A protein has these predicted regions:
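Hydrophobic membrane-insertion alpha-helices, especially the h-region
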Residues: 1-4
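Ser/Thr/Pro/Gly-rich low-complexity linker/stalk segments immediately outside membranes or between
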Residues: 7-21
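Short, conserved catalytic-motif segment at the N-terminal edge
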Residues: 19-69, 89-91, 154, 216-218
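Residue-level preference for non-acidic, small/hydrophobic
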Residues: 26, 40, 46, 74-77, ...
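Short active-site loop at a secondary-structure junction
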Residues: 32-37, 58-114, 158-170, 226-229
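Short, surface-exposed loop or secondary-structure junction motifs
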Residues: 107-262
Length: 262
């Protein structure tokens, strides 16, 4: 009961945020929180800048914080999928059984369905490591590896010809496993190499819990859900990442093109 009350209060408070001004939203979300550190970046007229805010939305001394960027990780995974397509390693209209060892005689979604969250998959599926993770206060997805993901894909029954949008962390975990199979490398290694050597983002990588803020999610190097939300970065790299899309580079431009109507 207490948990439900806590969630209800939290949801009620969050509903207020969209109607607030930028300044009011900052003050509201940092009210009375002495540990609050929110970094806001702006790109205007080709110039990027940022400011850091603390308790009660007050601007504080400039510092570069390492944040968990959460599901922005998915956009990086999507870029890696697009790169794999350009290299001829996969096709977006291929179904998963072309890249994963799965039971015959079943219907599997296409790569493009996973990218657009129209695969029919749930946000996630229960796996046994989640029990221990709950009691140890860990990241829910800690210890769920690629083998478990492939096994789950083989068990899920998808009987419709098409599915409507349903946000799926599981779907992006599957994409990570597909990338591992087509490249023969772990998603962590692929992502870290892509971020550093192809994108030049020196402070963006799969989380190793080494940032300055603490309380980062714990991950194993072979966790399948890394590709759904494990990357950490700072505001300078994130502004640079945003500029890649604004500058109309070929890879980023193609990733913004419409691929499916949902």
């Amino acid at each position: 009961i207490a948990f439900r009350i806590y969630v209800s209060i939290g949801m009620a408070r969050m509903k207020k945020v969209p109607s607030l001004s930028f300044k009011d939203a900052l003050e509201y979300t940092t009210k009375g929180n002495k540990e609050a550190l929110i970094t806001v970046g702006i790109i205007k007229d080709g110039k990027a800048e940022y400011r850091v805010y603390g308790e009660n939305g007050k601007e504080v001394e400039d510092r570069l914080c390492t944040y968990e960027i959460g599901s922005i990780t998915k956009t990086i995974t999507a870029l890696m999928v697009k790169r794999a397509e350009k290299e001829g390693k996969l096709e977006l209209d291929d179904t998963l059984d072309k890249y994963l060892s799965l039971p015959d005689g079943k219907k599997y979604p296409k790569i493009i369905d996973l990218l657009t969250h129209t695969s029919g998959y749930k946000p996630y599926y229960f796996e046994s490591p989640m029990i221990e993770n709950f009691f140890k206060g860990r990241n829910d997805f800690y210890g769920i590896n690629g083998e478990m993901i492939v096994d789950r894909v083989g068990k899920v029954n998808l009987d419709k010809e098409s599915y409507s949008f349903n946000y799926s962390n599981f779907g992006f975990a599957v994409l990570g496993v597909v990338l591992e199979n087509v490249y023969g490398e772990s998603w962590k290694k692929l992502a870290d190499d892509f971020l550093l050597n192809e994108m030049g983002l020196k402070n963006t990588h799969v989380s190793d819990e080494s940032g300055d803020l603490g309380n980062y999610w714990d991950w194993r190097d072979d966790d399948a859900y890394l590709s759904a939300g494990s990357v950490t970065s700072n505001i300078c790299d994130m502004l640079k990442y945003a500029e890649f899309y604004l500058k109309n580079d070929e890879l980023y431009r193609e990733c913004q093109e419409s691929v499916k109507t949902i």
